[in-house]
Each structure stands twice: as C-alpha cells, then as structure tokens.
Curated annotation (Swiss-Prot):
It comes from Streptococcus thermophilus (strain ATCC BAA-250 / LMG 18311). HAMAP family: Recomb_XerS. It is found in: Cytoplasm. FtsK is required for recombination. Belongs to the 'phage' integrase family. XerS subfamily. This is Tyrosine recombinase XerS. Residues 16-121 form the Core-binding (CB) domain. GO terms for molecular function: DNA binding; tyrosine-based site-specific recombinase activity.
Length: 356
C-alpha cells in the first residue's frame, strides 16, 4: 500500500477509536513502530471492538464510546469466546470455502491485543503515575503455533531461495533475458526502471535487509566505496550493514542515471525513486513486492523480498557456518532466529545418511 493511502487509512481508523487506543497509538509512534504495523494493529482493534459491541459485552453505541473498564473486566472466558468467533465466523473471502480466519490471523489478532493490554497495564502512566489498570487477561490466553519442525519449514523455504549461482543467474536473467518476451510497450516501461530494479534486487540479495529498511534508505545512507549501508532497524535502532561486492556495479549503474531519469532534485533524498508525471517520489514497499514477484516468477518461482533476505542469510551461513555472524548481518539480537538456516544447509546430514 502506498504511503499516502496508508496514512489515510490510519486516520480513518483513528477516528473510530476510543481515547485509550489513541494514546497507545501516539506512544508506539514515538518508539517508533512502523506505520504498516500500526495500521495492522488498528484493523485488529476495530475487529475486536465491533465484536465487544455485537456480543453485548459492551453497551457502547460505537467503538469510540467503549469504556476502558470493559477491557479491565474482560474474563478469560470472554476472550476464549472471541477466539471461537474468529475460528467459526463465515469467511470474508468469497472464493474460500473455509469457515473462520486462519490460525496465523488469529495469532496476529491476539498479538495486537496483547500489545494494547501490556501498554494499559504496565507501560502507561495515569495522573497518579500508575497504569490505568493491572489485570491483564491476555496473559491467560495462549496462541496455537503451527505444527512444523524447523527441518520441515527449511525444506519448504529452500524451494523459494536462489542459492549458489542462482543469485547471479537471477540478476543476469533480469538484466539480459527478461525483456525478450515483452511487447514493445512493456519494454518501454521495463527500460525506464531497469537499472533501479536491478539495484534494488542486488541490494536485497547482497545485504539481507528487510523490505522496510530498503524502502527507507536515503542517498546519504549508502557508501559504495566501503559497500556499507546505514539502516533503521526494528525498534528504531540505527545499524551499519555490509553488502556483498557483487551488488556494486548494479548500484553504480542506477546512481549514474537516477537524477536525470527520475528528475530528482536536491530535496529528493530517497535512494530509490519512482516518477509519475514528472514528480519523483520514494518508491513504496508494495511496488518493490510486485517488482520482485514479477521477475522471480518469470525466472523460476514467485518469491517475496523476504525470501531474498532468507537467500542472503542461507548463503552467508553456508559460507561461514557462523550463526552469530548471520544474526548480526540480519540485525537479530539472538542467534535463535537463525536456527532455520542450519537446517536449510544440511548437506552434511544428507551425506552422512548416504554413507550408512
């Protein structure tokens, strides 16, 4: 979703919310949480508050009128009824024959509510310096995790990674082969953004940064001489991230045409630009997702920018066998998240089995 539309949607949801959610929003904006995260949380709160009214737990006429005491007095049984409602309600997707929402969606909803309750019961300071209330019903609600071992997840993800020489083959395909089957009209659009698209893909594959981190890069954040980019990680921390040298020519090519191609002026500080009717703007996450999906599907299999992050992490672990190094590259505080990559790179285990 484009940033302007995202901000419009956020304001629309904020206009519906009770005062304590608006306080929560302002607090998390200062952390800062991303606008995308806050938007998703507001959507979940709207769904939950509508249920409170429809089920008769709250006698408020609208969401904004819901009293904070309603949240304080919710029982474990109430929350379990809400989860049951999510599981059994008719699907909003008319193409799906399934009832209810997925477990992933339920977990996301409960996570959003847990964040709100933690704020209200632990983080906020009322006039007396104390939280608004202390009883946190969400601590009594457990989430159901998907039953899948790391090995099974790794095998599933492995099919969607560009490992070994496929990393360079993918870049070469976009640069030299993708255009062959395009119409003349499609070629015109492709040529306009070719250098930029290659630079973005190369940056993701060479650094493993998150999509949001790539989108928010400014010109001042990249140092091609040292092959380092400065990014803002989750939670707002600044971090310097190394890039593999294979990305340099793609980034240099893009930077050489950036100003003229996208009509960039001094005030246009974003690294990756898009241009519409002569006006340059920072490229948004949705555009990059669609771009990566388009090229990857034509090359081998449709993937997301996050799979390019997995690709870099797996290749780096394969080369170093160091989870610590990989976790630092990805910006993780612990190596637990990188356990996945030890299962993707499991040739030693397979070789041992072959020798039995």
């Amino acid at each position: 979703m484009k940033r302007e539309l995202l901000l419009e949607k956020i304001e629309e949801y904020k206009s519906l919310m009770p005062w304590f959610v608006l306080e929560y929003y302002q607090s998390k904006l200062s952390v800062p949480y991303s606008f995308t995260t806050l938007y998703e949380y507001l959507k979940e709160y709207k769904r939950f508050f509508n249920w409170l009214i429809d089920s008769g737990i709250s006698d408020a006429d609208d969401i904004a009128s819901i009293h904070i005491k309603t949240l304080e007095n919710l029982t474990k049984k109430d929350m379990e009824s809400f989860v049951l409602y999510l599981r059994e309600r008719p699907s909003l997707n008319t193409y799906s024959k399934k009832q209810g929402v997925s477990q992933t969606t339920i977990n996301r909803t409960l996570s959003a509510l847990s964040c709100l309750y933690k704020y209200l019961t632990e983080e906020v300071e009322g006039p007396d310096g104390e939280p608004y209330f202390y009883r946190n019903v969400m601590k009594k609600i457990s989430t159901k995790k998907k039953k899948e071992t790391l090995a099974a997840r790794a095998e599933n993800i492995k099919q969607k990674l560009f490992l070994g020489d496929e990393t360079m083959k993918f870049l070469d395909y976009v640069e030299n082969e993708y255009e062959v089957k395009l119409s003349n009209r499609a070629k015109s659009s492709f040529y306009k953004n070719k250098e930029r698209d290659l630079a973005i893909i190369a940056l993701l594959l060479s650094s493993g940064v998150r999509l949001s981190e790539a989108v928010n890069l400014d010109l001042k954040d990249i140092n091609l001489k040292r092959m380092v980019i400065d990014v803002t990680r989750k939670g707002g921390q600044r971090d310097s991230v190394n890039m593999a040298s294979f990305a340099r020519p793609y980034l240099e090519n893009y930077l050489s045409i950036r100003n003229k191609r996208y009509k960039a002026e001094k005030q246009d500080v974003a690294l990756f630009l898009t241009e519409y009717r002569g006006v340059p703007n920072r490229i948004d996450a949705s555009s990059i997702e669609k771009m990566v999906a388009k090229y990857s599907q034509d090359f081998k299999i449709r993937v997301t920018p996050h799979k390019l992050r997995h690709t870099l992490a797996t290749r780096l672990y394969d080369a170093t066998k160091s989870q610590v190094l990989v976790s630092h590259q990805l910006g993780h505080a612990s190596t637990q998240v990188t356990d996945l990559y030890t299962h993707i790179v499991n040739d030693e285990q397979k070789n041992a089995l072959d020798n039995l």
